[in-house]
């Protein structure tokens, strides 16, 4: 009888300890960042060799804790939004006002979606994506942008940009920017279809591309 009672007590204690153990909640990334600085790079008719004569701008936006150091690397904590191919009309050289849609069409007022590209057995992101530089570097990651829109309105030297994207993990990505947006002319320095410079230390999650 004593052994039976002892078994009941041990079982009750085990069940109580199990009830108290809760799984760790999923890590939450900032899906509505405020970008405080950025720039646009103009590449002209970058895809003219492929029959698309629309001009292309690459747009980079950063949260205020990210910066570029003396050797040209991105350092700090925060979010980095990169839109590699923003298509504009052949007559435009600055980012015009309007709503831009994530699309593969290559038409004006579209942005190429984020995808995986494989070169020499290495997987790289192309198109539209956001990089998260977290305090815990093990949480730092990159997410592709696969749908949604971006709206840009210019007031003098200030651009107001609002994002309403969908990421490859099905989550929404908002975000806003309101500041001066310098435009850098790369059309002469970068031949059509040539590789464009990126930050060398952009990381990829271990399972990226799988």
Short names for language-model regions:
Residues 1-8:
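Bacterial N-terminal signal peptides that target proteins for export
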Residues 16-17:
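C-terminal motif of bacterial Sec signal peptides marking the signal peptidase cleavage site
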Residues 20-58:
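Charge-rich, low-complexity N-terminal segments
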Residues 23-26, 146-147, 162-210:
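Edge beta-strand at a domain terminus
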Residues 25, 49-153, 209:
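Surface-exposed helix/loop patches within compact recognition domains
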Residues 55, 79, 157-159, 171, ...:
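Residues at beta-strand starts and edge strands
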Residues 87, 156, 165-167:
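A mature extracytoplasmic/lumenal domain signature
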């Amino acid at each position: 009888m004593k052994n039976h009672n002892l078994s009941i007590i041990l079982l009750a204690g085990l069940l109580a300890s199990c009830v108290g153990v809760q799984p760790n909640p999923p890590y939450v990334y900032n899906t509505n960042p405020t970008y405080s600085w950025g720039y646009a790079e103009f590449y002209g008719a970058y895809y003219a060799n492929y029959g698309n004569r629309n001009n292309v701008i690459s747009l980079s936006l950063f949260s205020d804790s990210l910066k570029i150091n003396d050797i040209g690397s991105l350092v700090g904590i925060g979010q980095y939004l990169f839109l590699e191919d923003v298509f504009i009309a052949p007559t435009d050289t600055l980012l015009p006002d309007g709503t831009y849609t994530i699309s593969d069409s290559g038409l004006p007022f579209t942005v190429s979606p984020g995808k995986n590209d494989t070169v020499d057995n290495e997987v790289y992101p192309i198109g539209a994506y956001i990089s998260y530089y977290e305090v815990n570097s093990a949480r730092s990651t990159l997410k592709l942008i696969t749908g949604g829109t971006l709206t840009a309105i210019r007031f003098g030297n200030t651009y107001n940009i609002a994002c309403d994207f969908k990421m490859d993990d099905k989550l929404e990505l908002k975000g806003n920017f309101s500041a001066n947006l310098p435009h850098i002319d790369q059309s002469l320095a970068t031949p059509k279809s040539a590789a464009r410079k990126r930050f060398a230390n952009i990381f990829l999650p271990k399972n990226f591309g799988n």
